[in-house]
Amino acid sequence: MDKKLKSKSKFLSLVLRHQPELIQLPLDANGWADIEVLLAGAARQGVNISLQDVLEIVATNDKQRFALSGDKRRIRASQGHSIDVDLQLTPVTPPDELYHGSATRFTDAILATGLQPGQRRHVHLSADVETAHKVGSRHGKPVIFRIDAKALTLAGHAFYLSANQVWLTDAVPPQYLSLLDTSPQG
C-alpha cells in the first residue's frame, strides 16, 4: 500500500474503530457506517479520500482491517474497536494454542497481570508464531507469548474469530500464558 493510501487507511481506522464523532459519523450497533456519509464527513474535515480510495484500501489491506457490506454501501472495521459495537461474533472453539506478540519492555507486566484489552474491547491473538512476531515487531524488540487456549476455554473464557482471522477473547490471566523461546538453536 502506498504512503497516501496508508495514511487514509489510518484515518479509516480512527473513525471506524475509535472516534466516529470526529467527522459526525453515525455507526449502527454493529459498527457499520454509510460510505457516502463517511466521505462527506471526511471532506468537511479537510480529509481527501474518495470512494475509489476506500474500495482500494479494503481490497488491498493485507490485514483485512475493514469489511464492506454486500451492497458495498457500508463499511466497518473488522475488529480493534475502543467504542462499544456488536460485531455479531459467535463463540468458536480455538486451536489448543494461540500466540500474542508484544515488545520485550512489556514482558514483566504481562507475566504478572496477563493480557488485558486496554482501550480495545478484546485481547488480540494470532493463530501462528509468524503473525505474532510481526505484531510484536511493530512495538519494539518482539517477544512471543504462547496462550493455552484449550485451558482458557475449559475455564469458561469465550473466543471469537474476527472476519480478518484475528482471535479475540476478553482477557488472558497470567497462568494461561508462557514465554515462547524464539532464540536461534545451535
Swiss-Prot record:
The Gene Ontology terms for molecular function here are: NAD+ poly-ADP-ribosyltransferase activity; tRNA 2'-phosphotransferase activity
Q: Which chain positions lie within coiled-coil regions?
A: none
Alphabetically list the UniProt keywords: NAD, Transferase
Q: InterPro entries annotated for this entry?
A: Ptrans_KptA/Tpt1 (IPR002745), RNA_2'-PTrans_C (IPR042081), RNA_2'-PTrans_KptA (IPR022928), RNA_2'-PTrans_N (IPR042080)
Q: What is its EC number?
A: 2.7.1.-
Q: Which Pfam families match?
A: PTS_2-RNA (PF01885)
- Which SUPFAM superfamilies does the UniProt record give? ADP-ribosylation
Supply one GO BP term.
Answer: tRNA splicing, via endonucleolytic cleavage and ligation
Q: Which HAMAP family match?
A: KptA
Q: Which family does it belong to?
A: Belongs to the KptA/TPT1 family.
Known function: Removes the 2'-phosphate from RNA via an intermediate in which the phosphate is ADP-ribosylated by NAD followed by a presumed transesterification to release the RNA and generate ADP-ribose 1''-2''-cyclic phosphate (APPR>P). May function as an ADP-ribosylase.
Which PANTHER family does this chain map to?
PUTATIVE PHOSPHOTRANSFERASE, TRNA 2'-PHOSPHOTRANSFERASE 1
Protein's name according to its UniProt entry:
Probable RNA 2'-phosphotransferase
The gene that this protein is the product of is: kptA
